């Protein structure tokens, strides 16, 4: 724990003490801190926790979560764990990971993608999609910015909020809440040639929008929202 830029070891000591009081002696400690902890701090933690100083590792903040395995590798935590578990050492396969992480930090271009859904107040609701978009953007040497937009906020009068996007993703969902906003989003993307990726419900939305506004089937919908339909 950092207080006025000084790392305090008491919280770690107390936590390990509590573990030992219930019969658990840690083999390895990962010490969270803003910056890398030095040998003096490691020695102090080791002294008061009965954990060998070589098993005290720094878990400092990183610019991206993908940097963290590299930091652990640099501290040789993998070697220590293998030795502790008496497992054979194998050739490291971290090089592709390092290549990806370095590329992530040096992307030459930038893209802004809108994620239009109804669970956007918690970005991790779409965690797998977020990471998939990130991987795709890095592969194309492009840094990614995702703008999360609540589909219930999208009206005919404010669709211009979508104009600053280079692409739109409408993910899956359930129920009819926010559906009209998603249909407006698909419409806006189509007439303005904004790349649109519809996943699950998002794909249904694009079909509904096209049926209504291009094919003239004004009441086209999904049975998920309306069972008394002519055009399904």
Task: Indicate residue ranges for each PLM-predicted region.
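N-terminal beta1-alpha1 cap of cysteine-dependent amidohydrolase-like domains
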Residues: 1-230
């Amino acid at each position: 724990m950092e207080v006025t830029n000084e790392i305090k070891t008491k919280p770690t000591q107390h936590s390990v003490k509590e573990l030992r009081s219930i019969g658990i002696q840690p083999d390895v400690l990962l010490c969270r801190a803003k910056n890398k902890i030095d040998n003096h701090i490691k020695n102090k933690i080791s002294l008061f926790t009965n954990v060998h100083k070589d098993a005290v590792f720094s878990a400092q903040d990183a610019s991206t979560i993908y940097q963290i395995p590299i930091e652990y590798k640099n501290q040789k935590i993998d070697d220590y764990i293998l030795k502790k578990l008496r497992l054979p050492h194998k050739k490291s396969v971290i090089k592709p990971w390092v290549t990806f992480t370095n590329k992530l930090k040096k992307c030459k271009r930038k893209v802004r993608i809108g994620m239009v859904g109804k669970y956007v107040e918690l970005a991790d609701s779409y965690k797998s999609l977020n990471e998939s978009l990130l991987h795709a953007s890095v592969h194309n040497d492009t840094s990614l910015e995702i703008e999360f937009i609540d589909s219930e906020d999208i009206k005919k009068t404010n669709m211009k909020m979508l104009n600053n996007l280079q692409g739109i993703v409408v993910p899956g969902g359930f129920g009819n809440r926010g559906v009209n906003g998603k249909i407006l989003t698909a419409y806006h993307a189509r007439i303005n040639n904004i790349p649109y990726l519809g996943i699950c419900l998002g794909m249904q939305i694009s079909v509904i929008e096209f049926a209504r506004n291009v094919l003239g089937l004004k009441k086209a919908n999904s049975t998920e929202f309306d069972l008394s339909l002519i055009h399904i």
